[in-house]
A protein has these predicted regions:
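Short, hinge-like loop/turn segments at secondary-structure boundaries
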Residues: 95-98, 166-170, 193-194, 288-293
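Small/polar-residue-rich loop-to-helix segments that shape phosphate-bearing ligand pockets
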Residues: 96, 118-123, 311-320
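Short, hydrophobic beta-strand segments that form beta-sheet elements in well-ordered domains
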Residues: 105-107, 151, 177-178, 272-276
Length: 340
C-alpha cells in the first residue's frame, strides 16, 4: 500500500523530521539528491552530460546537490540557476556555494547545446501560482531539449494537490519523488507530465498521518492478498460464501462473466449467475464452474425463480450490463422489493 499526500501533508511530514526528530534539512537534501542520481544512473547508465536547472527554493537545493554528485561520478555537468538570488533558501545557497567551490559552472541562461539528461529542479510541491513570463520561457526551453528528462520530486508546473497544470509544466520522462507519492502526480493531467514515477525513501515518515482518515492511499497487488480469505483444510466451497450475480442483458454476457469471475478470484465459494437466456451458451463456455440460471425477457413472468435465488445467496451483486430497458427496471425493482 502506498500513501498519497497533498502539498500541506508533505510539508508537515518534512517539518516533523526537521523540527521534532532533529534531522537537518541539508541531510534530507543530500539523501534526496543521492536517490535521484541512483535512479538517473539506473535509467541512463550511458549518460555522459547533464544539465540541471534549479530554482530558489529547496527543490533547487536538491538540484544543486544532484549536480555535485553527478560531477563526482564523472558526468559532465552544467547547472543553470533561474531563480531569484534574494529568494534563495539557506540550504539552496549552501549547495550553490559547495558546487562553485568544486568548479561546476553555474549559469543564469539555458545553454543552446544538447545534453544526455535534463534535470528539472525549478519548482517543488509548494507551487500554487500560474507560471508566466521568464519562468514559462524557461520551462518551454527545457521541454525543447532532446535529452532524457528527469524531475526532482515533482515536475515544475504541476499542482501537487490536484494535478492541474499551472500555466505550463516540465514534461518529464522520469520523476523521482521522495517519501510519498503526491496526489497531483497521479491525477491527470499532471500524471501525463510526470512520466515514470518512482518513490524513494529519504528518511521521512509520518506514522500519525498514515493512520489518519485524511490521507489517501492506493493498493498494490500484494496488498490485496491480505483481504483474501484463508482456506482451512477441513473446509469446502460452501464454507466461503454464496454470491448471486444478477448481470448481463441481451448481448452483455461479458459483464456477467467479469463480475462472476471477480467473485471467484476474490475468494467466493459458490457463484450463481442470473442472466438473460441469450447469454447461456457463452457463459457456460467461459465459466463452467459457475451455476447458471436464466430468464426469458419476453416471458410474461420472467423472474419466477428470483426469490429462491435471493434466499440462497449470502451476497447479491447486481447491475453489471443489465442496461436501462423496461425488463431491467422491473428486475431491479423486484430485487429491491424482495429484500426490503
Amino acid at each position: 500500500m502506498k500513501y498519497v499526500l497533498n502539498a500541506d501533508q508533505m510539508k508537515a511530514s518534512d517539518s516533523r523530521m526537521i523540527q521534532q526528530i532533529g534531522i537537518p534539512s541539508l541531510v534530507l537534501m543530500e539523501r534526496a539528491a543521492q536517490q535521484c542520481v541512483e535512479m538517473i544512473k539506473q535509467e541512463m547508465p550511458d549518460a555522459h552530460t547533464a544539465l540541471v536547472v534549479c530554482g530558489s527554493g529547496n527543490n533547487g537545493g536538491d538540484g544543486f546537490a544532484v549536480a555535485r554528485i553527478l560531477y563526482e561520478e564523472g558526468v559532465f555537468v552544467e547547472t543553470a540557476f533561474v531563480g531569484k538570488p534574494e529568494s534563495r533558501s539557506h540550504e539552496t545557497e549552501t549547495q550553490m556555494k559547495i558546487l562553485q567551490k568544486i568548479g561546476v559552472p553555474i549559469v543564469t541562461e539555458l545553454p543552446e547545446k544538447e545534453y544526455d539528461v535534463i534535470i528539472d529542479a525549478v519548482f517543488g510541491i509548494g507551487l500554487c501560482r500560474r507560471i508566466e513570463g521568464r519562468y514559462a520561457n524557461v520551462i518551454e526551453r527545457m521541454n525543447q531539449y532532446q535529452g532524457y528528462k528527469v524531475a526532482v520530486d515533482i515536475a515544475s508546473g504541476i499542482s501537487a494537490d490536484t494535478g492541474a497544470i499551472l500555466g505550463c509544466a516540465f514534461r518529464a520522462d522520469l520523476t523521482v519523488t521522495f517519501a510519498y507519492a503526491k496526489a497531483g502526480q497521479l491525477y491527470h493531467p499532471g500524471a501525463d507530465y510526470t512520466g515514470k514515477l518512482t518513490v524513494r525513501p529519504i528518511g521521512i515518515w509520518n506514522p500519525e498521518l498514515e493512520q489518519s482518515s485524511d490521507v489517501y492511499y492506493h493498493f498494490e497487488q500484494g496488498d490485496l492478498k491480505t483481504y483474501m480469505p484463508k482456506r482451512r483444510p477441513d473446509s469446502n466451497k460452501g464454507t466461503y460464501g454464496k454470491v448471486l450475480v444478477i448481470a448481463g442483458s441481451k448481448g452483455m454476457s461479458g459483464a456477467a462473466y467479469l463480475a462472476a469471475k471477480a467473485a471467484y478470484v476474490t475468494g467466493a465459494g459458490l457463484v450463481r449467475i442470473y442472466t438473460d437466456e441469450s447469454n447461456r451458451q457463452i457463459l457456460q463456455q467461459l465459466l463452467p464452474e459457475a451455476v447458471l440460471t436464466t430468464y426469458q425477457s419476453e416471458a410474461e413472468e420472467p423472474f419466477g425463480e428470483l426469490q429462491s435465488l435471493l434466499d440462497w445467496a449470502d451476497v447479491v451483486c447486481m447491475g453489471s450490463g443489465i442496461g436501462r430497458s423496461q425488463i431491467s427496471e422491473k428486475l431491479v425493482k423486484l430485487v429491491w422489493k424482495q429484500n426490503e
